[in-house]
Amino acid sequence: MLLRLLLAWAAAGPTLGQDPWAAEPRAACGPSSCYALFPRRRTFLEAWRACRELGGDLATPRTPEEAQRVDSLVGAGPASRLLWIGLQRQARQCQLQRPLRGFTWTTGDQDTAFTNWAQPASGGPCPAQRCVALEASGEHRWLEGSCTLAVDGYLCQFGFEGACPALQDEAGQAGPAVYTTPFHLVSTEFEWLPFGSVAAVQCQAGRGASLLCVKQPEGGVGWSRAGPLCLGTGCSPDNGGCEHECVEEVDGHVSCRCTEGFRLAADGRSCEDPCAQAPCEQQCEPGGPQGYSCHCRLGFRPAEDDPHRCVDTDECQIAGVCQQMCVNYVGGFECYCSEGHELEADGISCSPAGAMGAQASQDLGDELLDDGEDEEDEDEAWKAFNGGWTEMPGILWMEPTQPPDFALAYRPSFPEDREPQIPYPEPTWPPPLSAPRVPYHSSVLSVTRPVVVSATHPTLPSAHQPPVIPATHPALSRDHQIPVIAANYPDLPSAYQPGILSVSHSAQPPAHQPPMISTKYPELFPAHQSPMFPDTRVAGTQTTTHLPGIPPNHAPLVTTLGAQLPPQAPDALVLRTQATQLPIIPTAQPSLTTTSRSPVSPAHQISVPAATQPAALPTLLPSQSPTNQTSPISPTHPHSKAPQIPREDGPSPKLALWLPSPAPTAAPTALGEAGLAEHSQRDDRWLLVALLVPTCVFLVVLLALGIVYCTRCGPHAPNKRITDCYRWVIHAGSKSPTEPMPPRGSLTGVQTCRTSV
């Protein structure tokens, strides 16, 4: 160690007594840092403090690029000169296997990608602190030595935010620009000036300009003033030094401008395209905070994670973009039409193609024409009401009036006629009334036969038609009159047209009396089988009426049994009943009985005594003639209840007219027979179930027994003792070769050993 110190002292000996290094400080700057050489004798600690005072640190050339910049700055100096760099090692910190051999940068780390040691590492104890100096000549190798010795100079490194380029020489300029760096280094040979540097320009006219390297509003750093800087020159010589446009200011200065799509560069003279280096994928336009803005073509949109990139827009997700079918592809979409249609000129709409389209258009026109004819039929049907207003009894849910006398020669005397107080419920609202769709409509409330809506009514022979019983009743006021379309039977003679019997009620206000329309019985078609009122309820009750010959002083009564609906829904005007074909018995019977499909208890069966029955009708029905007719006659009893008619789309409850019966009849009725038949059918079903269930249980038990038998009672191998097993194993290998082998597939000779523990 002492020998090395002596060698170092001997190397520095010739310089003792001589002038220090007479070279001026100089620097080399790049876009991000500067290296400055100060030829002043300092120890390592003094050099480090000098760099810190200027805002830098001792040089730390970590990469080959930084080392090359230091080499260009030092150049070919004297061979004996040394310069301190920022590399030191503490005592007893030798790490020869590392690139820096245990040395540490003055910044506190050991990261490096470049080393240039002058001597190989020596395995010593490292008892003292060591520092590294750079040779000023040759290959600028690194030498380690004592940190307390003074060397010829030191290298400082300065970092900064940005740099301004050196100014270009102008035509009216008196000399090169002089630059002053923040670390107080003055020179005219800089290529880059760190942030905060000052440039002084001297012009021939005697006036100069001073510029400062500052931050620009759009980002980065630049000179505070753009050229040209010297007055009196104007734009005549060489366009004022401007690349695109030169503008002479009022004060004699000139400024440069760029055409549209370009921006002025940092030198103040040249122009650059901001989109030339922009990372836009499709389209770029100058402007914006970065000097450019990215845009996408039609059919694309900017990506959410990267606005410079464009992604496809799925136009088919937009509602109504195509009339029928839409297919999306990258950059656009296309509309398609289904089979039988073709795309129109707009590329969106579809129209029927060829003859099919013409036929479709013709069908559409015919449909519209039919709708117009239907509307005309409605108008004609309503015009028929002008001369057809007559006095009719109120709707079933209205107050009762005097009972009709049916235009008969006799007038039956009912004890209840003196106090006609029938408790009909008040309607919550009047049912809506609409015009009939066709002249012949099946919306009838009070008729002598049930209204058949779901099927066409067959034409009946004249011999099977019931007599006509005209309805008469007290006259009503003009406000209470209800329009009626008279019953019309084109297939029947007038002598055999059915009579229309209506319920007599008290007068109601006009707002609660919708018109009563009688039914005409032509052959109905399915299209004309809808009720006249848009909100109607049809009682689907199958009613069978036995009509005997009516003796004198007997009133024909028909009772329809069924469930009574609540009075809150009286908004129906149509009865759809399906009558069964039963012969009408002309002989006198004590009562008239009506049966329905649902079984009804005998308490609900109503009979009419003979004493209260009116005289026979003028024309009796022929005996033993099957018909599809019933005779619903409106009740006049003060305690009878009006039938409640449900909606057509709901359930079909039974229609009921309640009449008091003085004496219940004991004769068996068709209702009881129907109930017994249904009970018998139900008993047959239960008998079938009672037979099937035990049979299934018996089969399951047999199956279980078979499984148990197969698993527990099958053949098993006999149990053997463990000694037998050993004997079998031992003698198995000593069989004589002449012993015959059992045939393949046979269990003969196969011994199994099963032991019990």
Curated annotation (Swiss-Prot):
GO biological process: anatomical structure regression; cell migration; endothelial cell apoptotic process; fibroblast migration; fibroblast proliferation; lymph node development; positive regulation of endothelial cell apoptotic process; positive regulation of fibroblast proliferation
Modification sites for Phosphoserine: 746
Signal peptide coordinates: 1-17
Disulfide partners: 131-147, 316-326, 322-335, 337-350
GO cellular component: cytoplasm; external side of plasma membrane; extracellular exosome; extracellular matrix
Topological domains, Extracellular: 18-687
Keywords: Calcium, Disulfide bond, EGF-like domain, Glycoprotein, Lectin, Membrane, Phosphoprotein, Signal, Transmembrane, Transmembrane helix
Pfam family, any one: FXa_inhibition
Record-linked PROSITE patterns: C_TYPE_LECTIN_2 (PS50041), EGF_2 (PS01186), EGF_CA (PS01187)
Carbohydrate-modified residues: 60, 401, 428, 448, 456, 459, 472, 519, 541, 543-545, 587, 593-595, 598, 601, 612, 619, 623, 625, 627, 630-631, 636, 640
Biased composition (Low complexity): 618-627
A molecular function GO annotation: extracellular matrix binding
Start and end residues of each EGF-like domain: 312-351
Region Disordered: start-end pairs: 618-662, 737-757
Primary role: Cell surface glycoprotein involved in various biological processes including angiogenesis, immune response modulation, and tissue remodeling and repair. Participates in pericyte proliferation through positive modulation of the PDGF receptor signaling pathway. Acts as a scaffold for factor X, triggering allosteric changes and the spatial re-alignment of factor X with the TF-factor VIIa complex, thereby enhancing coagulation activation.
Subunit structure: Interacts with PDGFRA; this interaction promotes PDGF receptor signaling pathway. Interacts with integrin beta-1/ITGB1. Interacts with insulin receptor/INSR; this interaction diminishes INSR autophosphorylation.
Name the record gives this protein: Endosialin
Organism: Homo sapiens (Human)
Organism ancestry: Eukaryota, Metazoa, Chordata, Craniata, Vertebrata
